[in-house]
Amino acid sequence: RPHVHPPPEHQPPLEHPPPEYQPPHEKPPHVHPPPEYQPPYQKPPHEKSPYEPPPQEYQPPHEKPPQVKPPSEYQPPHEKPPHEHPPPEYQPPHEKP
């Protein structure tokens, strides 16, 4: 009888510790280094900038200002002027004194 091993139900809990105790995987984040270290390698492209600025100086002219005219087309009032002058057909009589 003494050899009766205790109930296995009591042993399983001890074998697998609660998952809450498991660390939150702090190691994965360590794999990716800080992004601050990457900018240094982006500096090389900066050398191209010297030739890029020239083209930008040519844009200042901005001859697109005419684009502001488009809104003018939206002015429906323009249709009224034609109404002001009556049809010339009624003027013929005026030609004969």
Swiss-Prot record:
Bias type Pro residues, positions: 9-22, 31-43
Keyword Transmembrane helix found: no
Keyword Repeat: yes
Keywords noted in UniProt: Nodulation, Repeat
Induction behaviour: During nodulation in legume roots after Rhizobium infection.
Region (Disordered) residue spans: 1-97
UniProt superkingdom: Eukaryota
GO biological process annotation, one example: nodulation
Family note: Belongs to the nodulin 75 family.
Function, in words: Involved in early stages of root nodule development.
Protein name per its UniProtKB record: Early nodulin-75
UniProt source species: Medicago sativa (Alfalfa)
